[in-house]
Swiss-Prot record:
Keyword Zinc: yes
CDD domains reported in the protein's UniProt record: hydroxyacylglutathione_hydrolase_MBL-fold
Cofactor: Zn(2+)
Enzyme class: hydrolase
Descriptive protein name: Hydroxyacylglutathione hydrolase
Length: 251
């Protein structure tokens, strides 16, 4: 398989998973034109579109792509039924697209119906986990998002986090503000600054790396807890997550 990221809008990524036999899967096409141009340039035919949630910057290109590729299957959660999804997926369901199997994982938080799609090693997680960060809570609660993170954290270390935005540098600046002496975060920030200076993407990232530099995956870390004002171990780790999200919202 060949993973292709297509920049869209200001900081979005639309993903293509190319089977290297002329066919591909499109993930979260917020706009159609860059997708259609890429399909033409690489001579690819889409087998399906998969949608993680209902926000416009993830679904806005569906209608135009389907208009060109008549009969195209569009997989997504119930909240995308009015955004072009014609195959509704549910938590725990496995879908198969041209021989490629994807596990559907419910990850409420950013939206209530948000799902992720996992086909080792690829995790298409929309606006749930970002590199060094997490999605805003537009509909769900911090506890829901914490539980979603815990579920995704059970995946293997080599999992490729294919998130939908280039937020890494701003997330790392926030992490440095919370834990200024953390060497993993400091080193990775320098690496990402170098990448971005050359116009290169910082994603996908790996779950192994995120365990080190993503504070939202480190709620058990006693140093982090102390920095957030938890002087005794919290009764519930989701309260650490909630405090982190609140601080990020106001950063």
């Amino acid at each position: 398989m060949n993973l292709i990221s297509i920049p869209a809008f200001q900081d979005n990524y639309i993903w293509l998973l190319d089977n290297q036999q002329g066919h591909c899967i499109i993930v979260d096409p917020g706009e159609a034109q860059p997708v259609l141009e890429t399909l033409d340039r690489l001579n690819l035919t889409p087998d399906a579109i998969v949608l993680t949630h209902h926000h416009h910057d993830h679904v806005g290109g569906v209608a135009q792509i389907v208009a060109r590729y008549s009969g195209l299957k569009v997989y997504g959660p119930q909240e995308t039924a009015d955004k072009g999804a014609n195959h509704i997926v549910h938590d725990g369901e496995t879908i198969e697209i041209n021989g490629q199997k994807f596990a559907t994982i419910a990850v409420p938080g950013h939206t209530l119906g948000h799902v992720a799609f996992y086909s080792a090693p690829y995790l298409f997680c929309g606006d749930t986990i970002f590199s060094a960060g997490c999605g805003r809570l537009f509909e769900g609660t911090a506890e829901q998002m914490f539980n979603s993170f815990q579920q995704l954290a059970q995946l293997p270390d080599n999992t490729l986090i294919c998130c939908a935005h280039e937020y890494t540098l701003s997330n790392l600046k926030f992490a440095r503000a919370i834990l200024p002496k953390d060497r993993h975060i400091e080193t990775y920030q320098q690496q990402v600054e170098a990448l971005r200076a050359k116009g290169q993407s910082s994603v996908p990232t790996t779950l192994q790396l995120e365990r080190k530099i993503n504070l939202f995956l480190r709620c058990h870390d006693t140093d982090l807890q102390r920095e957030l004002g938890f002087h005794t171990p919290p009764e519930h780790l989701h309260s650490v997550f909630s405090e982190l999200r609140l601080r990020k919202d106001n950063f």
